[in-house]
Amino acid sequence: MLIFWAVLGGFLLDALFGDPAWLPHPVVLMGRCISALEKHLRTALPKTPRGELAGGAAVAAVLPLGTLAVTGLACWAAARLHPALGLALQMLWCGQALAAKGLAQESRNVYKELAKGALPAARRAVARIVGRDTQNLTAAGVTRAAVETVAENASDGVIAPLLYMLLGGAPLALTYKAINTMDSMLGYKNEKYLYFGRCAAKLDDAANWLPSRLAALLWVAAAALTGNSARGAWRIWRRDRRRHASPNSAQTESACAGALGVQLAGPAYYFGEYYDKPTIGDPLREIEPRDILRANRMMYAESLLALVLGLAVRLMLIL
């Protein structure tokens, strides 16, 4: 029952408080470790494709295994001191592994600026949650970027960590976050990270394969619950779920596009370079700022569905 209560408590902590700025966050420490490992390995190993592959593989092995070992040991030690302390630590880390409230808050900030007609401020707000260049985006481009990141992060910021914590508590959820953080820092297909980041990207693809597909199916159900088009979500997911360089990113994006009846993705600039990405969905209507709020409602609905279904399965296995 420890994992059951840890997951439920962690979900409620995230829903109520999100990630307070004053509270140290494990992902920040993971980021510092990745940067330190990268700096050391780039210095120690040959600056060749093989050397960079070896360095990236070392990071991709050390960080997840180290995270699992350290967090697992910490949870075990806390539980040995007192069961309530062990549960409290697991709840805290489960809450920190989830990003539903933070994602909703950041995307809502984008909506607020767009609603005021403050395009420069909206560009700055969306730049906090997307990787693309935002300085020249139109209002529709800013809206599209925010909706896409809500849809994609519903999978790797909510459903995936929720699945892993249901399987192995906070240690496994934070191990997943370590893999996801590596990919966000190293998994670029540019000159700097083409080889060094390859293992991190492949590991993230593997870790997200099942969660992203579960998230897409849950998004279809969430569309029905929130008054959006479940039929459209299902149809566009079936058609466009592979229209992305990543095997996972278009899963929830396509379901979201279909649910809203808008077109997402398409060409974008990253670090000054133009990428001709395929579009996802049909432009049945023009995208509008309120679509950010609609995407958030679907994200919350699928999160609750995942929690209820996951805890129900967990309870049945225990009983």
Model feature map: region roles:
Residues 1-175, 179, 187-319:
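Hydrophobic alpha-helical transmembrane segments
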Residues 184:
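Glycine-rich phosphate/dinucleotide-binding loop and adjoining beta-alpha-beta core of small-molecule
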